[in-house]
């Protein structure tokens, strides 16, 4: 009904009808207000999505929180003052004036005994330019530069001498040693270089082929792949040993990353996305292992069938929000506070920059998590025992966790569940038990960053080759990533370790395979990082 018609009807109505008309108009207004609020919420949600995808494509990847200085008085003054006081403590006081600590000027570690080539620069003319008398040498200034010798190859020729008895004509020849790649010119150092370049430096095989061609050596990509595959066959017993050990560890970190295998198709005939799983022993475990494991898809069974805890003791697995980790028999899930924080950072990044209640709420959660991390950093700096860390966490961090989850329950009723902030709140609230679980044992970590970073190593390499041709190639790439990154986890020089491993593995019994692991007493000192 139009305004004019309503006015005419209202003017001609008696008192009872006027009240009914007004009541009807008020009900219509309420409905329109509800509709406007609903549309406004939808617009806010769509704007959040737009800002989220803009930030995803064009924004910075850092999760550092940029706080609006105009909002500091609301919730962040204490944190700011503490940060300033920390910075002030780092300023050195030297003889009446202050200066910031300088960064190290040493390009080379002092204990790195690099060879030094001395080049002396002397004057040819030793006559004084002022009086003409002969100059006397009184010392010298030094300029140092770090130089690199371009990679060189050489051929090592083994000669096995033959002997004959002049009396009885008996022929004798020196026995040949057992080598990993018989009847070929491919040495452990060459194959070790293939492996190191691909699985530590993420250098694709076709680029390795090009680099050898530049040195005048005709090594095809297919030959590189063939010999890396042969190395995998030799190394498999050690890989299986790592698998056995990591399944026995009482604390494990886990993560996963995508991998396309060309020969694996889905029902529509498209290349199926499979997953590489990454498992890492905890820092407290006596054998540091980084284990990559390929299996078809992201099904729960890929994780639940790998880990089987048949003992009575409690075991823990650090992981992100993927539900499969919750279903591993005999393992308790320890959720990741870095993931929880990331959800609030994402919510903050899609909000308008002007001060608002939502920004305040979001920053409060980020600051509370920041307080937890501040304590964790202090524990590491103090180098306290795991038992002491558990005690201090219960005293210092538990009250912060109580406040964090209490606020989540309060704010969950105030924000839209489908908004970024709503999703961040729900993410942490539904994982309260597993987010608190790190308080149970001082060996547990507040987050799963260690496994995440290792999964990213595989993802970085994947960008250079995108996919594997077949499942066997995916399995072997996981084997090599495991060998390389387990060496790194044990503070070994990965290339030197791989060469040493290939040199010795052909003469080692499978029953003694752990003697070649990075924690073995047989590891030479020269392949250990200083």
Can you name each region flagged by the protein language model?
Residues 1-3, 23, 125, 162-164, ...:
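Catalytic center-proximal scaffold of phosphoryl-transfer enzymes
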Residues 1-182, 224-225, 253-254, 260, ...:
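Short, flexible loop/hinge motifs at secondary-structure junctions
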């Amino acid at each position: 009904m139009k305004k004019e018609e309503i006015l005419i009807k209202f003017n001609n109505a008696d008192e009872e009808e006027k009240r009914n008309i007004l009541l009807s108009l008020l009900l219509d207004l309420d409905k329109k207000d509800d509709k406007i609020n609903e549309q406004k919420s939808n617009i806010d949600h769509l704007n959040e999505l737009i800002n989220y995808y803009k930030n995803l494509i064009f924004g910075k990847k850092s999760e550092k929180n940029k706080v609006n200085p105009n909002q500091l008085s609301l919730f962040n003054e204490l944190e700011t003052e503490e940060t300033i006081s920390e910075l002030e403590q780092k300023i050195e006081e030297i003889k009446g004036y202050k200066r910031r600590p300088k960064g190290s000027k040493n390009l080379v570690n002092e204990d790195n005994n690099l060879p030094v080539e001395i080049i002396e620069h002397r004057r040819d003319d030793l006559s004084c330019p002022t009086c003409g008398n002969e100059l006397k040498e009184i010392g010298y200034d030094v300029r140092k530069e770090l130089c690199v010798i371009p990679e060189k190859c050489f051929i090592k020729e083994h000669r096995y001498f033959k002997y004959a008895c002049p009396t009885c004509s008996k022929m004798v020849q020196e026995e040949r040693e057992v080598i990993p790649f018989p009847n070929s010119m491919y040495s452990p150092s060459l194959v070790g270089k293939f492996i190191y370049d691909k699985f530590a430096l993420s250098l694709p095989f076709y680029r390795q082929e090009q680099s050898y061609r530049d040195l005048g050596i005709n090594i095809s990509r297919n030959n590189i792949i063939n010999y890396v595959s042969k190395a995998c066959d030799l190394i498999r017993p050690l890989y299986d040993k790592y698998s056995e050990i990591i399944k026995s560890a009482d604390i494990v970190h886990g993560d996963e990353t995508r991998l396309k295998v060309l020969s694996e198709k889905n029902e529509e005939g498209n290349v199926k996305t499979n997953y590489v799983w990454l498992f890492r022993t905890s820092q407290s475990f006596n054998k540091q292992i980084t284990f990559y494991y390929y299996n078809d898809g992201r099904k729960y069974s890929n994780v639940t069938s790998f880990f089987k805890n048949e003992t009575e003791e409690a075991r823990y697995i650090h992981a992100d929000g993927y539900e499969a980790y919750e279903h591993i028999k005999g393992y308790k899930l320890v959720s990741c506070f870095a993931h929880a924080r990331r959800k609030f950072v994402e919510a903050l990044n899609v909000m308008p920059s002007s001060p608002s209640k939502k920004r305040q709420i979001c920053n409060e959660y980020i600051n509370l998590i920041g307080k937890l991390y501040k304590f964790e950093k202090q524990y590491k700096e103090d180098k306290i025992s795991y038992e002491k860390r558990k005690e201090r966490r219960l005293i210092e961090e538990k009250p912060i966790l109580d406040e964090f989850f209490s606020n989540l329950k309060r704010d969950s009723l105030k924000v839209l569940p489908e908004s970024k902030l709503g999703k961040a709140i729900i993410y942490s609230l539904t994982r309260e038990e597993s987010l608190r679980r790190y308080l149970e044992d001082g060996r547990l970590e507040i987050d799963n960053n260690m496994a995440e970073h290792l999964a990213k190593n595989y993802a970085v390499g994947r960008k250079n080759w995108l996919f594997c041709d077949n499942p066997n190639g995916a399995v072997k790439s996981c084997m090599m990533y495991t060998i390389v990154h387990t060496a790194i986890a044990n503070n070994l020089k990965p290339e030197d370790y791989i060469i040493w491993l290939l040199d010795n593995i052909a003469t080692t019994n499978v029953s003694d395979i752990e003697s070649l692991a990075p924690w073995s007493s047989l590891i030479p000192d020269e392949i250990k990082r200083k």
